[in-house]
Design a protein with these regions (language model features):
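Acidic beta-strand-to-loop metal/phosphate-binding motif
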Residues: 108, 167-176
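Phosphate-handling DNA/RNA-contact segment within nucleic-acid enzymes
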Residues: 54-162
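Basic, glycine-enriched DNA-binding surface that flanks or lies within the catalytic cores of DNA
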Residues: 1-92, 97
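Generic alpha-helical structural element
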Residues: 16-20, 107, 175
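Residue-level recognition of short, well-ordered coil/turn positions
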Residues: 31, 164-165
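Conserved beta-strand termini and adjacent loop/short-helix elements that scaffold enzyme active sites
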Residues: 44, 137, 172-174
Length: 176
């Protein structure tokens, strides 16, 4: 039974990933049905950036740290339900992303699906989506009334701290 003494701090909480399904058909069909490109889906599945969970076959979008350890995960129902959220222990500074080195810019999205949709559009335009920094903010960012009181989203702060070459930030926010 949790007490004040044995509750771990946010930073100490381990990421609790759901059980991984041995198959990916449900997630693949869901993403393909949302218009995401076949090659992009396969890349994400092969790299375990996306997994299919059991028992509900949700799509789970995973973010990793520099040591390739999962530190963030968001789940989304693959049926008509609007069930979605972050897995327990998720650290938003490691949110879902497709990254390239030394591009000088980063593209920010509210969620993983928006990011994957943009990568698909880039491919349709003949651009190599692997050559861009595409990062999910892991939810909608809402600045304070006084902009000076606002904080930089943690995932962006961490990225800017780690990659000093970034000079341009492109926002892809739709507030849906």
């Amino acid at each position: 039974f949790p007490t004040c003494e044995n509750i771990k701090s946010y930073e100490e909480q381990p990421l609790l990933l759901p059980q991984k399904s041995p198959t990916t058909e449900v997630v693949f069909d869901y993403l393909f049905g949302r218009g995401i490109d076949y090659e992009i889906i396969n890349h994400c599945l092969e790299q375990e950036l996306i997994i299919e969970s059991l028992p509900y076959h949700n799509a789970v979008f995973i973010g990793y740290d520099e040591n390739k350890e999962p530190k963030y995960a968001a789940y989304r129902a693959t049926n008509q339900s609007r069930i979605m959220g972050d897995c327990t222990g998720s650290k938003k500074q490691y949110s879902f992303r497709l990254t390239a080195e030394n591009t000088g810019e980063v593209h920010l999205f509210e969620c993983a699906i928006d990011l994957l949709s943009y990568a698909t559009l880039m491919k349709l335009e003949g651009k190599d989506w692997r050559q861009f920094n595409l990062v999910s903010l892991a939810g909608v960012y809402s600045p304070k009334q006084k902009i000076e009181d606002s904080k930089v989203p943690v995932t962006l702060g961490r990225l800017l701290e780690k990659d000093k070459t970034i000079r341009r930030i492109v926002l892809h926010l739709d507030n849906d």
